[in-house]
UniProtKB/Swiss-Prot annotation:
Keywords: Membrane, Transmembrane, Transmembrane helix. This is RH-like protein. It comes from Hylobates pileatus (Pileated gibbon). The keyword Transmembrane applies. The chain crosses the membrane at residues 11-31, 45-65, 77-97, 125-145, 167-187, 209-229, 238-258, 287-307. InterPro entries: Ammonium/urea_transptr (IPR029020), NH4_transpt_AmtB-like_dom (IPR024041), RhesusRHD (IPR002229). One of its GO terms (biological process) is ammonium homeostasis. GO terms for cellular component: plasma membrane.
């Protein structure tokens, strides 16, 4: 469906975005250069492969998870890709400027792109709370402000607590969830004309959203291990993330079916609950030395995710109740925070388990 903004506004919004892109090109021209060091070819290929996994998670996983709004069922994927492309550029510059004193030219490495992609995912998580309620320029401002705040927060945490990149980036779930809630809460009320139609859920949202969840599920071990440099820690992170995801998936599907009077699986809850284990072990995945610990975390995460989805929506005020199902998609900290729990909807799809 076409935009309901006036023609004059529709013409200005893309021009603002193009102007910003031109400014970014100038910043890259004056303040960046490629790393000239010779890297080991084997290590270079491995680094690039991890970067590919992260891009698939961001572009396809989070993109399809936003496709359950009727007017944004497919355009949400384009908005997601737009924010990702813009966010990666800004995050590379921001991380470079914040990490060196005095500021100089930013050296771009594959690690820089990998870290920037993970940082940009914070805005893709938060946008679930406002998709359908903001225009293109507002999305651009949201990306720039959020990534600046997230990068500054990581720098402060690193300087005070002396943590590494892995621990810093794992705060993305908490930060993005509450940033998205804050933006949604600050948007003007009542919404502009036509917003109610934009907010309506599509009749069959589960297929594309579940496809996004599958992309995230498959590549989540890469996300949790992307910034670890010690081979043993990376191996532990991959193993523990996989076991936690597997157990949380079995738990979520079983409990969802058990809680339904007719034994059906609520697919809307599944989009996020199957990923609960990956979020739960994110910060400590490289420290867990035995698979049973990760499996217990996955079990608890699945129980909390489904239990919260079933019980908490009635207690949440607007706009948290309506937008809780959108906020953070599959990558948010739905294990711990009530803003992740989905509201009841007549359009929720269920699948019989027996």
């Amino acid at each position: 469906m076409s935009s309901k903004y006036p023609r004059s506004v529709r013409g200005c919004l893309p021009l603002w975005a193009l102007t910003l892109e031109a400014a970014l090109i100038l910043l890259f021209f004056f303040f960046t250069h490629y790393d000239a060091s010779l890297e080991d070819q084997k290590g270079l290929v491995a680094t690039y492969q991890v970067g590919q996994d992260l891009t698939v998670m961001a572009a396809l996983g989070l993109g399809f998870l936003t496709s359950n709004l009727r007017r944004h069922s497919w355009s949400s994927v384009a908005f997601n890709l737009f924010m990702l492309a813009l966010g990666v550029q800004w995050a590379i510059l921001l991380d470079g400027f914040l990490s060196q004193f005095p500021p100089g030219k930013v050296v771009i490495k594959l690690l820089s792109i990998r870290l920037a992609t993970m940082s940009a995912m914070s805005s893709l998580i938060s946008v679930g709370a406002v998709l359908g309620k903001v225009n293109l320029v507002q999305l651009v401002v949201m990306v720039l402000v959020e990534l600046t705040a997230f990068g500054t927060m990581r720098m402060v945490i690193n300087n005070i607590f002396k943590t590494d990149y892995h621990v810093n980036i794992m705060h993305i779930h908490v930060f993005a969830a509450y940033f998205g809630l804050t933006v949604a809460w600050c948007l003007p009320k009542p919404p502009p004309e036509g917003t109610e139609d934009k907010e309506q859920i599509a009749n069959s949202p589960s297929l594309s959203a579940m496809l996004g969840a599958l992309f995230l599920w498959i590549f989540w071990p890469s996300f949790n291990s992307a910034l670890l440099t010690n081979p043993i820690e990376r191996k532990n992170a991959v193993f523990n993330t996989y076991y936690a995801l597997a157990v949380s998936t079995v738990t979520a599907i079983s409990v969802s079916s058990l809680a339904h009077p007719q034994g059906k699986i609520n697919m809307t809850y599944m989009h996020n609950a199957v990923l609960a284990g990956g979020v739960a072990v994110g910060t400590s995945c490289h420290l867990i030395s035995s698979p049973w610990l990760a499996m217990v975390l996955g079990l608890v995460a699945g129980l909390i995710s489904i239990g919260g989805a079933k019980c908490l929506p009635d207690w949440l005020p607007d706009p948290l109740q309506h937008w809780g199902t959108q906020l953070g998609h599959g990558d948010s900290s739905h294990v711990w925070f009530p803003d992740r729990f989905a509201p009841k909807s007549q359009n929720m799809e269920s699948t019989s388990c027996g």
